[in-house]
């Protein structure tokens, strides 16, 4: 019997519980965050049609050129937040619903959110 806590399984349960109430609409799409050890990804999603409007990650050339070191730190997350906000504003999206996907609002997730707010997204 496995007694050690599977962190990703627990995160997934939190994510599914929150996703019952958090939905993106055309007026306020959902800003979703995915965090891996080496990278961070952000998508703005309209859940009514199931379509990603804009996205950014540490793998994008625009972000990668501004990175110094790893893509798995708070500085990289802040750059991704700024880039996704600029792309969203260019696509006509100003207000979003933040979906932290079961991650704690701390560290890289918080850095991405704060940078997106400073760049002009409202949530």
UniProtKB/Swiss-Prot annotation:
| Organism, as annotated | Symbiobacterium thermophilum (strain DSM 24528 / JCM 14929 / IAM 14863 / T)
* The UniProt record lists the keyword Repeat: no
Family recorded in the similarity comment: Belongs to the universal ribosomal protein uL18 family.
Indicate the quaternary assembly: Part of the 50S ribosomal subunit; part of the 5S rRNA/L5/L18/L25 subcomplex. Contacts the 5S and 23S rRNAs.
List, alphabetically, the SUPFAM superfamilies matched: Translational machinery components (SSF53137)
Which Pfam families does UniProt cross-reference here?
Ribosomal_L18p
Q: Which UniProt keywords apply?
A: Ribonucleoprotein, Ribosomal protein, RNA-binding, rRNA-binding
Can you provide one Gene Ontology molecular function annotated for this UniProt record? 5S rRNA binding
What name has this protein been given in UniProt? Large ribosomal subunit protein uL18
Function, in words: This is one of the proteins that bind and probably mediate the attachment of the 5S RNA into the large ribosomal subunit, where it forms part of the central protuberance.
Tell me which HAMAP family the record gives.
Ribosomal_uL18_B
Classify the source by domain of life.
Bacteria
Answer whether the UniProt record assigns the keyword Phosphoprotein to this protein.
no
The SS bond pairs are: none
